[in-house]
Amino acid sequence: MKSSGIAGDSNGFETNFLNETTNREEDGAFNWNAADDGTNERREDIHVRFQDSALPLGIDENELDEIDINGDSKKLDSVEVDESHDVNSPSDSRLKSSFKSVLELTANSMVSVLTPSTKTEQTSKGKGKKKKAHVSFLEGPVEEIPLDDIEPTSPREASPVFNGRPPIPPEFLKSRHKEFTIPNPLQFISNFLSNLFSRDTRYLKSSHGRIIIINPYDDSSQIDERTGKPYMQNSIVSSRYNKYNFVPLQIIAQFSKTANCYFLLIAIMQMIPGWSTTGTYTTIIPLLIFISIAILREGFDNYRRYRQDRVENRIQTQVLRHVDVDPPIVEEHSSFFRRRRWRRSRSQESASRSTIRSTDEREPERTSEDPPQLPPSPSSPSSPALSVKPNIDPQPPLYNSTLTTTRSIPANKPTFFWASCDRKDVRVGDIIRLTSDQTLPADVIALSSPNPNGAIYIETAALDGETSLKTRLVNSTLRSLCKDINDLIRLSGTCTVEDPNGDLYNFNGSMKLDSIQGEIPLSNNDVLYRGSNLRNTSELFALVIFTGEESKIRMNAVRNVSVKAPSMQKVTNRIVIFIFALVVSMAIYCTAAYFVWQKKVERKLWYLTNSKLSFVPILVSFIILYNTMVPISLYVSMEIIRVFQTFLVQSDIDLYYPENDTRCEVRSSSILEELGQVTHVFSDKTGTLTDNIMLFRNLSVGGFAWQHVGAENPKLVSTSQKSDDLDGEAKPPQLENIQGTTIQLLQYVHDNPHTTFSKRVRIFLLNLAICHTCLPSFDEENQIYKYQSISPDELALVHAAQQLGYIVIDRDIDSLTIRLHYPLDPHSHPIAKTYRILNIIEFTSKRKCMSVIVRMPNGRICLFCKGADSAIIKRLRLSNLAKRKDKSVTKAEQARKSIEIDKAIIRNSQSTSRPSLTASRPSLSRRRNDYINNVTSWLDERREKMGVVRPRASTSILETRRRPAVGRHSLAGGERLMEDKKYLSKQEEAEGSIYESLNHNDAKLFENTFEHVHAFATDGLRTLMYAHRFIDESEYQSWKLVNDAALNSLSNRQQLLDEAADLIEKDLEFAGATAIEDKLQVGVPESINSLFRAGIKFWMLTGDKKETAINIGHSCGVIKEYSTVVVMGSLDGVEGSDETVSGGQRLSLDRPPTNDPASLMIHQLISCMNAIHSNSLAHLVIVIDGSTLADIENDPELFLLFINTAVEADSVICCRSSPMQKALMVQKVRNTLEKAVTLAIGDGANDIAMIQEAHVGIGIAGREGLQAARSSDFSIGRFKFLIKLLFCHGRWSYVRLSKYILGTFYKEQFFFLMQAIMQPFVGYTGQSLYESWGLTCFNTLFSSLCVIGLGIFEKDLSASTVIAVPELYQKGINNEAFNWRVYFGWCSIAFIQAFLVFYVTYSLFGMKELNDNNIFAYGQLIFTAAIFIMNFKLVFIEMQYINIISIIVLVLTSLAWFLFNIFISEHYPDKNLYLARSQFLHHFGKNPSWWLTMLFVMVCALTIDIVAQMLRRTLRPTDTDIFVEMENDAFVRSRFEQESGEFLQANAPSVDEIEQYLKSRD
């Protein structure tokens, strides 16, 4: 009798239980969606389809029930059958059969339909649970539907992953996820508190979507039916903590450090009376101080983020507001009673107006207790009153009210105006006004635009990373109803939109206005998202629908960002646990030894009476005695070191970008050492790798290639990897086809205007000028034409046409005017021609081309077409010939590159074990000269293995620029005609015949052009082909009827349009090709190459299209000549077609049994894994787009297979990815590879989620603003700065922190082991060897400064060395500086030195000096020797970079120790166990034996350390040891400085300096 949200229909029905909405479909279905509370990742959907025309259910709409899925009780809307219904009727069987249609479950699923009185069931087997979703009826037998009888479907019809996918071999499904690890209870509590104090309500579902009341007269806050409260404010919050959760989360974070928990336990034991031998509060007070310092530092970082948010939230926005008078200012001469009467009248009118609500029955009614709503303040959405003097727009009021005539007398109608208010005060339902170049403050529905056809131009770089302009068209109905403010104030109705979500590409909604009949449908074209920039639109009126954290850009940001902890902290915590276990073990041993000693010795000593101790006090006393083996200042000193390291990073001049005055900013100093251990870099493309500046580089026309002179010098601007490779053996021969510059081309066309070649050139240039959608505008100030386009490619092409004499000067809906002139002659007379635009066939990803049909000035109709090579070739008149030539050119190109593949495989196989200079060597010093002599060849060899060739030291930089190639084709084909690039001026007559001959040889023309296109693509350029066709009038009119019918179709419109386009885009004449460079930032290819050499894997995650991403991959070196590029889900990608694999190695793969995309992807991934394991791939790059990734996510096994393959690949390119998909990729790599350290770098707001998800987040402060920079851990000005940040500061920080931690553990264990060694001499009574005041100052005055100096100033290698040799970065990746082996090495030295110092001192001084052999003199001798041994070791043995500050610190520490001895000698109490008073000054301090013993012990201990270091460096030298030696040679240093000059502009020597040095050396 009851069901939630089900509506019957004679043709079927559909209901969505999760959304509680009713939607009709022809086939009849209802969706049952079960989602876990609190999560948005897992969702179970059951589609039940009724094919019968009659509905056999009696239904009501108000009850919720429960259902058991996976053993969890979930609250769901359920279906109940009418008790009177006959379950045995025929309709019941039809009902049961219809339940067999099921959609996706998140794992291997089985659905059972249970009739009434049957309880829910659950089955699970092993890891993969077989889930059963149950629907209960009131009575009847049980029917179970096996999985084989179910027809799986997907909510997305395009989802490929559930239809007959083949089984995946289990060896490829070995999950490396850390899903079986025991969860950290502190992390669990942290997550709980985070969710408790900052509950996220954005994902709650409403029953009918969000209903927004449109009523400009009502300024009251609208109510969100999901929460019963006003809609979320428009303020944003990027800070990690709030005032409620900061203290508890920080306490948890601090005590997640094992050392802090250890000292808390010690402090508790110390405060128990009678247990401590060192005092009561000596641990708890320092512990609280150190923890408070750490919490305050984190709080300061969080406060800085809060202030940045406040700046963002206070940006001014114009909102439509009203007041009772205009403005509500009372005249000064008004009487007191008159002003009072005016206020009372205004209050009553506001109260009555606030009760006006929409008559929609779904709007919640206001209760009688609700206070009356008054006109709002522009500064606060919750404030009911408008300020007395509102900030009114300076323009005159657009609504002329009679109220303005009498300012002091209230009237019936309010005055509307545009009030400037803070962005945070914009509310849902507000109507806002925006002007050009403003940033949208919230997600809005566009209402009106003054541009023709209601066009709106926006830049969405902050959302998807694309800086190209996008066009939105305002709905024509809305545009007619919202022309000005007079129309806006009359606007009344409701707007229903979907609930807040993060989908940037789909939107559904509708608007119902009182002034018109029916509803206005709303789509993604009608909505503008927060963060977008309004361009070329003078004014925009818009309705706010989503605000603050519910806006799309914030929905795609990571919420409740967890505190990032460095990887080294895990190892440090484990070592602390080990030391604690060691302390407990030593305490237990000493306690047991004490009872043995008590039984055998103490009982016989008559002078020891009443001295027996129990087990617990003696055990605790030993634990407290040894507890400082873990220094209490460990983590606080690390914070001090990080503060100084932060200063060094931020003051680095090499990381300063002067163009926008940006320096490197460190926002999370706690993870500085993570920069030295990065294994994966995830990078955005637009604005991060590129400048998003398209540069027209080359064109090919008539079978000859030309370099555009508008492009800058290739060496200076080219970001292609090939810019430095042309002199290497891998030089593509096709680049030699470049004949000259476009200036020479124009000169030839001008001098020979009537030749066939010239005519071909002119029609090609006309194609450039016509086939686009750019809008021209004239800049009066600079007297030039500027263009706006949604595509930067088109912008570059139109600019090129302008430079070549075809200037687009005007454009409207149906015409295009071009001014023709000869650019080489400033006195030429331009001619303007107007072309009537008949049709524009827009570009689609399926067609991969666009066409413009125009009527020429002479009346003829011509179609101009441009697109990808694959799209144009099949549309040509000579398509068969073109396909054959394209295939032959491709085959020849692949044959050439197969040689490079074989060489790369050989290089990779030779370097499998990472050949370095660390092979076994009998003597480092003996072979040092060999290394120095071969350093140049070694560096060249490492570059060659990465496919990079760079100039030698003695080569002038000017000589290494790309040399212009010359032509090599003749009439016979294949022979080189010219050796000089300037042959046009010398052999015009011969060349003219050459050009004309090729225009009559179609086969040769195609062959040459395709060679050019391959060469351009290999060079990383974006290529397009052009074609045209003249059309008869009758043919065009016939086609126009078909095209118009497709345009007016209400169903399958795009398909019909594509079919119509195919009818006219045929039999085209080939015109030529162009090559555009998406200009990379300076140094990007070199930076990415350095990352590869360092062993770092590079993933490019971009929102751009696939072709663009692949082209950029070629340009920046992610895709190499010998790379195998696998495009997921693309059959062409499997075959290695030119479209997706530009000359790369073909992946050997049998055809999948079906064309099912899921089967195809499984075959692709399995083949990749097999090839990787067999080492048959030189370089693997996987390309996947966002839609394919979304489909893969729905199949856990396929997704696991993809991740396992992707982490093995050399690089991954993810295109068309949303912000959350970027974050998902980072998260999956983190979870899959336990030891991976991920770094994400981006510059836009769409990169924030990825940046916050990675271990290290880096934001680039660039053209897209500071959103990413503010949310990152580090911010830099350019991508190339990443190299020094990682290789220098990251590596140094890792080495410094490693040596600091090791040095701290070393000094504590060395110092306190001698306490344990002394215990047999004092009967294991816990007697301390050292005086208590000295112990108190040991970690603060006498041993901390030198080890902190080591952690601040250490540089094991210079900056030029670590940048010139990126392989040295693997020291951090492999954890070579800080691991258990290195730790035990330091412990061994401490253990040996402790025994040596104690027993040598005991032998030389303790037993022979009868005058001064008391425990104080003996202890001070060992104390003094220990201090000098520790500090000398840390400064002179362990530190490679010894500076004056380290020496000063050592001297100050030594002086502090002797001053301390002088102080206690004068002021120490007389009555004490330690006879310290006057001892140092008057007794053992004057004894030469005391000083000589100390010096002898120091020399012995340090000698052991030096000998151990020499043996290690001789027998097992590391890369660092070798390059430390090499740096001692001036030539090697100069060579390294030259190699690193690209990244060290402040210190790089010039080529002349290098050459001068080499001459002086000779």
Swiss-Prot record:
* Bias (Acidic residues): 60-69
Q: Which domain of life is it from?
A: Eukaryota
Topology check: give the Extracellular ranges. 1-275, 596-614, 1331-1332, 1403-1414, 1465-1490
**Where is Mg(2+) annotated to bind?**
D684, T686, D1243
Q: List where the protein spans the membrane.
A: 276-296, 575-595, 615-635, 1310-1330, 1333-1353, 1382-1402, 1415-1435, 1444-1464, 1491-1511
| InterPro entries the UniProt entry points to | ATPase_P-typ_cyto_dom_N, ATPase_P-typ_P_site, ATPase_P-typ_TM_dom_sf, ATPase_P-typ_transduc_dom_A_sf, HAD-like_sf, HAD_sf, P-type_ATPase_IV, P-type_ATPase_N
Sequence ranges of Basic and acidic residues compositional bias:
71-86, 358-369
The Enzyme Commission number assigned here is: 7.6.2.1
Its function? Catalytic component of a P4-ATPase flippase complex which catalyzes the hydrolysis of ATP coupled to the transport of phosphatidylcholine and small amounts of phosphatidylethanolamine from the lumen to the cytosolic leaflet of the trans-Golgi network and ensures the maintenance of asymmetric distribution of phospholipids. May be involved in transport from early endosomes to the trans-Golgi network (TGN).
Instruction: Indicate what this protein is called per its UniProt record.
Output: Phospholipid-transporting ATPase dnf1
